[in-house]
Design a protein with these regions (language model features):
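Extreme N-terminal tail/first-helix region
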Residues: 1-11
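Short, conserved beta-strand element in jelly-roll/cupin
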Residues: 33-49
Length: 88
């Protein structure tokens, strides 16, 4: 699927705000929360998400969803990461 198709899919699921985000290699986001539910679909590279003490690495085509107000952290892979974000 193209980035546009992935964004449209998230919008059909009720994610009113969708956009493409790209992080540099090895970018880290320490523990934080969002006031809304977020969905992330990896387009290229990889992203490791840690939530509730569990870490999982996502690659191209993978999706991870983070509930509103869930404490989590993220680390990008050695090639960075490009991903679609949906917020609702």
């Amino acid at each position: 699927m193209t980035e546009r198709e992935l964004m449209a899919r998230l919008q059909r699921e009720g994610f009113a705000h969708t956009y493409v985000w790209q992080d540099d290699p090895n970018t880290e986001y320490g523990e934080h929360t969002h006031g809304m539910e977020t969905a992330h679909i990896v387009v290229s590279g990889e992203l490791t998400l840690t939530m509730n003490g569990n870490s999982h690495t996502y690659g191209p085509g993978d999706r991870c969803d983070v509930p509103a107000n869930a404490v989590h952290s993220a680390r990008m892979g050695p090639r960075g990461c490009r991903y679609i974000i949906g917020e609702r």
